């Protein structure tokens, strides 16, 4: 049975309330057990004042989304895949955060370790979806009524896209309220899309829960942040975006609705490639949100403008699929 906007609003409200109830209890615990963010010296100098801010606050959002998802609808295939994406990628992020903070390894998981875990989970999600849904390999093409059937190539294509999305969302989490605000808007789009065009109640519920969780978390994470989501939260949100798009066969809309994620990841690739080729930097700093900071923009201005851009991209995405 499809849920209307009223029921989805209730769903978002439940997740929101869970976050704002748990937050004031959990954040002091993070501070007590010294789960504080270590700000790197090679980042923007204005961020040094954030050193020691509690991190791994993404756990709050994960708990809220899981509880809401499990209680609002009967759990079947799509809800199970969605929760696995969120909890699974969130757990990889948790390992990364824990190693950084408690084992004092500044970069967390080694790059190959992180990629192996992400690829393994993405293979599970892609393979499970391909073998469980007869329409999984039919990808919707934005701005048209056509779909493209990629057949068995669905698995490697989805693996690449899943890993790319998760890491792009992770890169977006560099300013107070940026990743949570952008993902809130992205989740609103998928909530509307899943509940109307795609006809997928479970994805609509997951998206609504993510809307509520992100909105509640913004109360603690907006500038000046009382807590950071950490890789725990950013990878979990990446897993949520993966679930929304994969389960509605709409991954090709991600470069539009997720344009900020795409720009953040692309800026890093350009910076690294350009530096290797010329020994010079293309941007003043990457990801691109730091470039604008280095240009003199206040952090709050960068975040607000990126939110506005995402709202515009959401409107364009609505035109593309409705």
Swiss-Prot record:
Coiled-coil stretches noted in the UniProt entry, renumbered to this chain = none
Q: Where in the cell is it found?
A: Cell membrane
Q: In which pathway does it act?
A: Cell wall biogenesis; peptidoglycan biosynthesis
Q: Mind telling me which CDD domains this protein's record contains?
A: GT_MraY (cd06852)
**A GO term from the CC aspect:** plasma membrane
Transmembrane spans: 10-30, 51-71, 79-99, 107-127, 146-166, 178-198, 203-223, 227-247, 250-270, 302-322
Keywords on record:
Cell cycle, Cell division, Cell membrane, Cell shape, Cell wall biogenesis/degradation, Magnesium, Membrane, Metal-binding, Peptidoglycan synthesis, Transferase, Transmembrane, Transmembrane helix
Recorded E.C. number(s)? 2.7.8.13
Q: Does the keyword Cell division apply?
A: yes
Q: Does the keyword Cytoplasm apply?
A: no
State the family it belongs to: Belongs to the glycosyltransferase 4 family. MraY subfamily.
> Which PANTHER family does this chain map to?
PHOSPHO-N-ACETYLMURAMOYL-PENTAPEPTIDE-TRANSFERASE (PTHR22926), PHOSPHO-N-ACETYLMURAMOYL-PENTAPEPTIDE-TRANSFERASE HOMOLOG (PTHR22926:SF5)
| Function (record text) | Catalyzes the initial step of the lipid cycle reactions in the biosynthesis of the cell wall peptidoglycan: transfers peptidoglycan precursor phospho-MurNAc-pentapeptide from UDP-MurNAc-pentapeptide onto the lipid carrier undecaprenyl phosphate, yielding undecaprenyl-pyrophosphoryl-MurNAc-pentapeptide, known as lipid I.
Return the protein name: Phospho-N-acetylmuramoyl-pentapeptide-transferase
Q: What is the lineage of its organism?
A: Bacteria, Bacillati, Bacillota, Clostridia, Peptostreptococcales
Name of the gene:
mraY
